[in-house]
Amino acid sequence: MLRIYNTITKSEEVFKTLNNEEVKIYVCGPTVYDETHIGHGRTYVSFDIIRRYLEHIGYSVKLVINFTDIDDKIINRALNLNVTPKKISEKYIEIFLNDMKTLNVKPADIYPKVTENIPEIISFIDKLIEKGFAYKTDSGVYFEIEKFKDYGKLSNINLENLISEDKLESKSEKKNRFDFALWKNKKSGEPYWKSPFGDGRPGWHIECSVMSMKYLGEQFDIHGGGRDLSFPHHENEIAQSSAYSGKNWVNYWVHTGFVMVNGEKMSKSLGNFVTISEISKKYSPEVLRLFFIQRHYKSPIDYTEESMEHAKASLQKLYNVIESVRIALENPVNSVWDENEAFFYNVLKNSKINFYRAMDSDFNSVNALKTVFEVSNSVTKYLSVSKSPNVALLIKTLDFFKNVGEIFGLFEGYFYKSSNVKEESLIKFLVDLRDDLRSKKNYETSDKIRDGLKELGYQIEDSSKENTVFKKINI
């Protein structure tokens, strides 16, 4: 039973979807004014693994990741380079999507842009004003946090303390220092859109509320992002979204930990970041994915050359083990079942159980990865003591690694390269081996191969007149 840590309740909860087998997820996307660094990469790889696991255990996932393509940072970058904000945003959207492809992050179902949803944003703000949660000033429209009594629940901030400690300058138009902008009236030289409250552009927080509701509905399952977005961004999103609909907007809040460099968060503002394109020149994307997987998604992770080299060596070890299993299958194999087979079978069976148990416990990749190396070490030992390994065990071992690869986004270079040619070659080898065993009337072993292939999704069709036929089936 899957359990997820919910930031808003500060507890691990049994995961229950709003709509049967479909999971709707919204992850805050990048403000596209610069290149993607590995701190961003960790967030999107983490949610990619969450998405992959949910799909693996039978859910249908609808994922939305937005692009903030109009913002102060984008405008300032455009002014400095004497180009339009659109030119800046389009450039870095393309870079982001290429970086995600490099990292083997599965594409979102929808990548909405702020500038393509302005009418919906204006309508949303208009309703908040109508319901008394927002007010107009000469500089724009603000959300009045005092009107939303649950403000601060996500980030554990006391609303009364915020209000009592507030000291506004007399010249401020806001009723409270923490009231946040829904709409910013235009300034000279900046892009703007016409609205009932004046020409201008959206504030940062409003965009995610509007786009998530547009594509996922007024209530959905999971909202995520980096831990730094918890306050004020996600707190403000909750306030305006719940005020708008009167409903509980999101069921589970999921936040990823920081990538740290010398004890500080990796960030553009500190200048201590490494871009995806830079690190990809030195390490394969799978090394970076394994580096992330070695820590729980909620925990901070220290980026060092040593940690990257460790991840590189660990990945190579796993590839070597998978290749050794494949080579063993190319040599004569049998159905012998003695204490060596029994011992390894129990390791494999228990490791598989513990892998899923770990992933069901808030996607605990750390404990899940331990089971992968348990299988790796055990099959290495098994192959070293067995002159003729058991074919069914070897098939199950490859199947285990393939499932791990599908969930973690690893082993692409082995299982999925060249349109699965390697897999089909292996299956054909096993089918031919089975034919040979049948011709020698070794039906016990040939039946085990048939059953093992069926578990992998291949159906055997025997014929007395021609070679055995195999075909892929849904399992």
UniProtKB/Swiss-Prot annotation:
Question: Can you tell which superkingdom this protein's organism belongs to?
Answer: Archaea
Task: Tell me which residues bind Zn(2+).
Answer: C28, C208, H233, E237
Q: Per the Swiss-Prot or TrEMBL record, what residue ranges does the short sequence motif 'HIGH' region cover?
A: 30-40
Q: Which InterPro entries match?
A: Cys-tRNA-ligase (IPR015803), Cys-tRNA-synt_Ia_DALR (IPR015273), Cys-tRNA/MSH_ligase (IPR024909), Rossmann-like_a/b/a_fold (IPR014729), tRNA-synt_1_cat_dom (IPR032678), tRNAsynth_Ia_anticodon-bd (IPR009080)
Q: Where is this motif: 'KMSKS' region?
A: 265-269
How is the cofactor bound, in the record's words?
Binds 1 zinc ion per subunit.
Q: Gene name, please?
A: cysS
Q: What name goes with this protein?
A: Cysteine--tRNA ligase
